[in-house]
Design a protein with these regions (language model features):
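Walker B motif beta-strand of ABC-family P-loop ATPases
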Residues: 49-51
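Walker B catalytic motif
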Residues: 54-55
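Short coil-to-helix N-cap segments within the nucleotide-binding domains
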Residues: 58-59
Length: 141
């Protein structure tokens, strides 16, 4: 399969206008289009490990769903996806296999999706080390 055909096929994954594949990376893209472009690039490159850092930042609810659907469609036994987020809302659409809480550059708590739900409900104060950390989510099929 030639590259342009592959790119157009993968653009459909995140409902990206296939004419955008002819633009330079992120040239003239809105914030939501840039995030969808990240997922599009992941689909084209098919990495065995992908790290998505705050991929939900600045997304409206429709764009969030599109990005999450794009991530979910790429879940496989051959790929690990690490999603870094501060908010539970992304995890309403991407159910994590593991959740790790980072604070001060260290993992201070680990668990399943219920850990993220507890953080959303109770905040970070209950953690032994306290402080605000990033919610680091690992997804494995």
């Amino acid at each position: 399969m030639d590259f342009m055909k592959l790119a157009r096929e993968k653009a459909k994954l995140v409902e990206m206008d296939d004419r955008l594949v002819n633009r330079a990376i992120n040239e003239g893209f809105s914030g939501g289009e840039k995030k969808r472009n990240e997922i599009f690039q992941m689909a084209v490159l098919e990495p065995s490990l992908a790290i998505l850092d705050e991929t939900d930042s600045g997304l409206d609810i429709d764009a969030l769903r599109l990005v999450a659907e794009g991530v979910n469609r790429q879940r496989s036994a051959e790929r690990s996806i690490i999603v870094v987020t501060h908010y539970q809302r992304l995890l309403d659409y991407i159910v994590p296999d593991f959740v790790h809480v980072l604070a001060g550059g260290r993992i201070v708590a680990s668990g399943g999706a219920d850990l993220a739900e507890k953080l959303e409900a109770q905040g970070y104060a209950w953690l032994e080390r306290g402080g605000i950390g990033k919610l680091d989510v690992e997804i494995r099929a």
